[in-house]
Amino acid sequence: MSSKVSRDTLYEAVREVLQGSKKKKRKFLETVELQISLKNYDPQKDKRFSGTVRLKSTPRPKFSLCVLGDQQHCDEAKAVDLPHMDIEALKKLNKNKKLVKKLAKKYDAFLASESLIKQIPRILGPGLNKAGKFPSLLTHNENLVAKVDEVKSTIKFQMKKVLCLAVAVGHVKLTEEELVYNIHLSINFLVSLLKKNWQNVRALYIKSTMGKPQRLY
């Protein structure tokens, strides 16, 4: 366990979050979010960090993904009912900013074949990149379903201009153990990205979408 957040604290907070969500049943699956508040950090001067870490349990089961594929990848995607678009479909968007923005909004992430990935900025313009959804590379040696699972369970920490971050680390249908594992992994990874590690952390909370925040640190 990470030195600054004890195992007991973590389990207690997770228990509170899960019990809170059981008391008030929602019509949707609540996400559990890790909220981080930083200190001694100047977003203007200090390097803005970003990094990704793969969790054990997928934080968002409803995560939607689209394959921008060559013929083979489109066929593979079709076989497993995954949304996909080929180069012709992308060209039809005609670099129209509104349409590209709509595409970026429609999916949580994209995978693209090697032959397409280099052409995306030229065909679509900067829209996907601006939305923070530039596709991950999909090669032919990779199993499509495994790659999709990997993308679904990977979370990204990205420092913007403000000193607080929030990332989805799970949902309320996960077990205590699964949530604790995901949160523990996320905290350790985040702290490793910070210049002064724990000295940059002001506070850590976890909360479900509609629940009360529980303080970890």
From Swiss-Prot:
**Cellular compartments annotated:** Cytoplasm
Coiled-coil annotation reads: none
Any one annotated GO CC term: cytosolic large ribosomal subunit
Which Gene Ontology molecular-function terms are recorded? RNA binding; structural constituent of ribosome
**What is the annotated quaternary arrangement, including any partners?**
Component of the large ribosomal subunit.
Family of this protein: Belongs to the universal ribosomal protein uL1 family.
Q: What is this protein called?
A: Large ribosomal subunit protein uL1
From what organism does this protein derive? Xenopus laevis
Lineage start? Eukaryota, Metazoa, Chordata, Craniata, Vertebrata
